[in-house]
Amino acid sequence: MMYPYMTFEDGTEVVHSDLIVDGDIEKVIVHFERPTAEGFDSARCELPSYNWTMWEGRFTDEEKRGFETFLSNNAHLLYRYAANGGAKVA
């Protein structure tokens, strides 16, 4: 299951998975998606390795660096929310 986390000013949606246990590693999948005239720009990153598993559309290298900074700054919260079934928002 994927849970909403944040929407950036340009319309990019950030969602994350449940906590995934793979052997002795706890993982979270984070997906970035932005609507375009042709469909979507999409990127997916796996934490804690910061491995990009999908990159489609027209996100720029600068945006990718921004996503990596965002992930680094938010990883602790993404893990917390993933373990608890998403952020609880009223």
Q: What feature does the model see in each segment?
A:
Residues M1-I20:
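Negatively charged, low-complexity tracts enriched in Asp/Glu with abundant Ser/Thr
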Residues Y5-M6, H31-F32, R65:
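Intrinsically disordered, low-complexity segments enriched in polar/charged residues with Gly/Pro
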Residues T7, E13, R44-E46, K88:
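Ser/Thr- (and often Asn-) enriched beta-sheet segments in non-cytosolic proteins
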Residues H16-F59:
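A short, structured beta-strand/loop element
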